[in-house]
A protein has these predicted regions:
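ATP-binding N-terminal substructure of ATP-dependent carboxylate-amine bond-forming enzymes
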Residues: 1-108, 112-118, 122-125, 138-149
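Phosphate-binding site of ATP-dependent enzymes
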Residues: 172-273, 300-302
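Conserved metal-phosphate-binding beta-hairpin within the catalytic cores
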Residues: 198, 279-312, 322
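Glycine-rich phosphate/pyrophosphate-binding beta-alpha loops
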Residues: 83, 168, 307-321
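Peripheral (often C-terminal) accessory segments that flank ATP-dependent C-N-forming ligase machineries
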Residues: 257, 261-262, 266-269, 273, ...
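Hydrophobic beta-strand scaffold residues
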Residues: 37, 101-102, 130-131, 158, ...
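Active-site nucleotide/adenylate-binding loops and adjacent lid/helix of ATP-dependent enzymes
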Residues: 2-9, 13, 71, 112-203, ...
Length: 343
């Protein structure tokens, strides 16, 4: 019997449209002869099942839909909601209460990794990778008089970003004191907590990791990484005047993404090994991407963030990394489903 898959996309954050693009890519790659796939869209107006342009209601009391008089219960939720409520643990807690399996990390890991100000100290405590100095601000911007106190122990430039968010929305590179307060105010428009983080010069690298189901043909593919696929490392090179991998660089083509990265094998393997270990230490599940800066002067790797629901559009980083291993998007998502169903 075909399993019912809820492909959940959208969300309440500025990443809503990106999530829809990722969700549509996944929808087009799933095996519809094997699964009944339902597009479930979340937005500020409500939750609905999108069927041939119609918006049909979702019963949130038990996460079901009515398909021509037949109540449809779901065997699995394939979560593609970037930001709130998909990456912050809210949907995961909801599905846990309903007993519905899903393709991502659990609620606790999702909540922790989504909040950069809380995740960074935890990652630092593992001793695997360096973490930049930072200050976490709560509820409201500081006064002008407090800026120097805030920057004590840090030096410009700094990044100012929402503590919980993604796709570099409302993220600013601040080069001097005069720019700091306005950047903090902008970040507070996206979140109630804001992170001010010291800029680390260097090369940006990303590495995807995923678990695969037992019995997969990839068992034993690399003796260093048991029971997981650790993808080739990608280097992100902003172009067109972009100083970092901001929203436009990510989605409007203002970056070169080189995979496999043209870097010494020892550095690439170190990035893969750190990603592999962080995946377990943080309790990750599903497809996850880890982002880093390699400071060439210090020859040190710095942790940037974890993406527990990385983008899956045709040009997103993880699908490109998978293709570098000879894994098609269809195979990638099939492995994700099978691993989740086996939980």
């Amino acid at each position: 019997m075909k399993k019912n898959i809820a492909l959940v996309m959208g969300g309440y954050s500025g990443e809503h449209d990106i999530s829809i693009a990722s969700g549509n890519q996944v929808y087009n790659q799933l095996d519809h002869s094997k699964y009944n796939v339902y597009k479930i869209v979340i937005d500020r107006e409500g939750w609905y099942w999108e069927r041939n342009g119609e918006h049909l209601p979702v019963d949130r009391s038990d996460f079901t839909v009515n398909d021509n008089g037949r109540k449809v219960c779901f065997d699995l939720a394939f979560i593609m909601v970037h930001g709130n409520p998909g990456e912050n643990g809210v949907l995961q807690g909801y599905f846990d209460m309903l007993g519905i399996r899903y393709t991502t990390s659990g609620y606790y890991t999702s909540a922790l990794t989504f909040q950069k100000g809380y995740c960074n100290p935890v990652v630092k405590s593992f001793g695997l990778v360096k973490v930049a100095k930072s200050v976490l601000l709560y509820k409201e911007p500081p006064t002008e008089a407090k800026l120097d106190e805030l920057m004590e122990g840090m030096r410009y430039p700094v990044f100012v970003k929402p503590a919980a968010g993604g796709s570099s929305v409302a993220t600013t590179k601040v080069k001097c004191r005069e720019q700091l307060l306005s950047a903090i105010r902008e970040a507070f428009t996206e979140d109630r907590q804001v992170l001010v983080e010291e800029f680390i010069p260097g090369r940006e690298f990303d590495c995807g990791v995923m678990q695969f189901p037992r019995g997969s043909k990839y068992e034993g593919w690399n003796p260093d990484f048991k029971h997981k696929l650790v993808f080739p490392v990608t280097e992100i090179i902003p172009i067109g005047g972009h100083e970092f991998f901001d929203y436009e660089a990510k989605y409007d083509g203002f970056s070169n993404e080189v995979c496999p990265a043209e870097v010494d094998d020892s550095i690439a393997h170190h990035i893969q090994e750190v990603s592999y270990r962080l995946y377990d230490l943080l309790g990750c599940r599903g497809i996850v991407r880890f982002d880093y800066i390699y400071n060439t002067e210090e020859q040190e790797l710095y942790f940037l963030e974890v993406n527990t629901i990385p983008g899956q559009s045709a040009e997103s980083i993880v699908p490109k990394q998978a293709r570098a291993l000879g894994i098609s998007p269809a195979e990638l998502y099939e492995m994700s489903i099978q691993a989740a169903l086996a939980q």
